[in-house]
Design a protein with these regions (language model features):
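Phosphate-binding site recognition
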Residues: 1-150
Length: 150
């Protein structure tokens, strides 16, 4: 059971009804249910849900680790063959290629600040992907989710 989030569900549903793709940001303190809210929205509305989560910031984690984690998660969740990635441009292009045009889909980029923390080009690559790929899809919500320090 999910309690106390009806306003957020309504806002997401309103976005879902629009005839264009939507880009949503979701931020808040750690462990308050941000990712669960998005997953529950997808479940309630019976839409395809792809969750890609950045690796936690810790010693030894590199941009390549983040890219390969993205590739593995994408492969696992879409039933496609794992193929290593070398840059975020290619990562977002692969994601775009796996989002079906006729299938309602929610893509959650979770812990996005961790995901892109080692590549100064990450924000620009994400912007390019939104402007030139994701925004062209009319059955897509892309959610950028991150935690803030309390």
């Amino acid at each position: 059971m999910f309690v106390g989030r009806e306003e957020q569900f309504k806002q997401l549903k309103d976005l879902w009804r629009k005839p264009v793709a939507s880009l949503v940001t979701c931020r808040g303190r750690r462990r308050i249910g941000k990712s669960t809210l998005i997953a529950e929205f997808a479940r309630r509305n019976r839409v395809r849900f792809i969750k890609l989560e950045g690796l936690p910031s810790r010693e030894g984690v590199t941009n390549d680790d983040q890219l390969q984690a993205f590739a593995r998660q994408l492969s696992d969740q879409t039933g496609t063959k794992y193929e290593p990635l070398t840059c975020w441009f290619d990562a977002f292009a692969r994601l775009d290629g796996l989002v079906e045009q006729k299938t309602k889909t929610v893509v959650l980029l979770d812990e996005i600040s961790w995901m892109g923390m080692f590549d100064v080009n990450f924000p620009g690559e994400l912007k390019y992907a939104w402007d030139n790929r994701f925004s062209k899809r009319n059955k897509l919500i892309v959610v950028l989710c991150g935690s803030v320090s309390s």
